[in-house]
């Protein structure tokens, strides 16, 4: 009986109930939207690191690891085949690729920029990284690849370099002597990792031999762990770190790092930045809570005489309190369901259409938007966010209704009946 009365009372004041429900629904919609968006950002960042930057696991010598920011070419890997064989013994490994990174300067007609160069073996690199599929203009390395280079698209735009033109790369060799060599720009790369687009250059081992005197030196081995579509980041991270620990036990003379070991602090910072958005969402829900309090209080004041009649008919204070609490819960359920529906609509849009940052910020570099992402950002489904939003909506309504309901239950019958 009380439930029927509560539902009837909620729909008696349609306009006020509608405004309260809409406020709550919009707040919950923003929560669902931002949750989907930030899970998508997390995935884009991690996928960018895995697909373009360092892959799932990186193996370097301990001497290299201790001075890795200087990219020391002398601290190379001595047991490449052994490490490759051990890595490929795991069922989830899709490929192992050698890389050698160096610091250099790209010079083009009087303009120059410091870059991080990466030396790759094209045929093996394709099994681990997606550099080839990220080509925006031009093509991949030819069979020899000796005098060819790939550079980031934003780097090319900054210096005015076109595909087919010649650039000069200046760098220190393995023996710490200065050298410079000309390369033809074979293609321009556009990835979801801003640092690659803005300051990276790729050479083949054959081409880098003349520039760096590598003599076949490989400073890092990058291992790709299979990542099935739909697997969450925490689940993937757990599998990768399990393999990393196992490899580290078998290779005590080397340092085995997962992508979380390398970028853990950066990813943690991204998590902390989410707090700002969630605070905004909380404020919206707080406004909704104030609206619910207002709705219930107005309902109490408008129905004081009715409350007196109910008490005269034998309703106890706790039943009056329960009636108004039920009204608040009904509003919360309606608002929660409306929020889930609106959240579903925006989720479908952001998951299947995405937000194209490249078009939105055309003419700008990826780093100019202040986020470590580029290209099209897609959201991710998170059923937990829908359930939490609904539960939070009902909880906020219940808490917001408590004090008005308590006030109504404490009214005296004589006071209520005299109220006009």
Residue ranges of model-derived segments:
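N-terminal Sec/SRP start-transfer signal
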Residues: 1-32, 51, 317-318, 322, ...
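A hydrophobic alpha-helix feature that marks transmembrane segments and, especially
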Residues: 31-36, 274-313, 320-325, 397, ...
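Hydrophobic, regular-secondary-structure patches
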Residues: 35-116, 139-145
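Mechanotransmission and gating elements of multispan inner-membrane complexes involved in transport
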Residues: 51, 173-277
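Hydrophobic secondary-structure segments that place a key small or acidic residue at a functional site
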Residues: 99-102, 111-120, 135-207
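Transmembrane alpha-helical interface segments in multi-pass membrane proteins
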Residues: 297, 305-351, 388
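Short helix-loop junctions at transmembrane helix boundaries
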Residues: 338-388
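C-terminal membrane-exit region of the final transmembrane helix in multipass inner-membrane proteins
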Residues: 375-420
């Amino acid at each position: 009986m009380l439930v029927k009365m509560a539902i009837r009372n909620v729909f008696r004041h349609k306009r006020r109930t509608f405004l309260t429900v809409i406020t709550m629904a919009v707040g919950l919609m923003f929560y669902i939207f931002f949750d989907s968006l930030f899970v998508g950002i997390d995935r884009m960042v991690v996928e960018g690191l895995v697909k373009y930057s360092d892959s799932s696991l990186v193996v370097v010598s301990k001497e290299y690891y201790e001075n890795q920011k200087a990219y020391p070419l002398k601290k190379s890997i001595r047991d490449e085949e052994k490490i490759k064989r051990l890595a490929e013994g795991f069922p989830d490994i899709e490929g192992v690729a050698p890389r050698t990174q160096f610091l250099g300067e790209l010079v083009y007609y009087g303009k120059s920029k410091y870059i991080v160069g990466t030396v790759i073996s094209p045929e093996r690199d394709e099994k681990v990284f997606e550099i080839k599929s990220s080509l925006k203009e031009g093509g991949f390395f030819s069979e020899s690849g000796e005098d060819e280079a790939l550079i980031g698209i934003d780097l090319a735009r900054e210096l005015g370099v076109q595909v087919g033109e010649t650039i000069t790369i200046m760098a220190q060799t393995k023996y710490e002597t200065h050298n410079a060599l000309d390369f033809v720009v074979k293609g321009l790369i556009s990835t979801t990792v801003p640092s690659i687009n803005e300051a990276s250059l790729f050479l083949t081992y054959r081409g880098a031999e003349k520039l760096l005197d590598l003599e076949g030196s490989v400073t890092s081995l990058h291992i790709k762990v299979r990542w099935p579509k739909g697997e969450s980041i925490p689940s993937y991270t757990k599998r990768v770190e399990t393999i990393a620990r196992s490899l580290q036990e078998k290779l005590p003379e080397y340092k085995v790092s997962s992508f979380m070991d390398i970028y853990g602090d950066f990813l943690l910072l991204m998590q902390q930045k989410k707090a700002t958005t969630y605070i905004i969402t909380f404020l919206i829900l707080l406004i909704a809570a104030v609206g619910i309090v207002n709705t219930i209080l107005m309902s109490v004041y408008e129905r004081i005489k009715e409350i007196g009649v109910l008490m005269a008919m034998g309703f106890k204070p706790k039943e009056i309190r329960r009636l108004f609490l039920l009204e608040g819960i009904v509003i919360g359920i309606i608002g929660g369901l409306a929020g889930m529906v609106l959240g579903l609509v925006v989720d479908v849009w952001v998951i299947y259409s995405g937000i194209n940052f490249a078009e939105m910020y055309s003419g700008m570099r990826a780093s100019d938007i202040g986020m470590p992402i580029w290209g099209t950002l897609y959201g991710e489904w998170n059923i937990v966010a829908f359930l939490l939003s609904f539960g939070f909506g009902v909880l906020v309504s219940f808490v917001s209704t408590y004090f008005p309901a308590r006030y109504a239950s404490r009214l005296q019958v004589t006071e209520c009946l005299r109220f006009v």
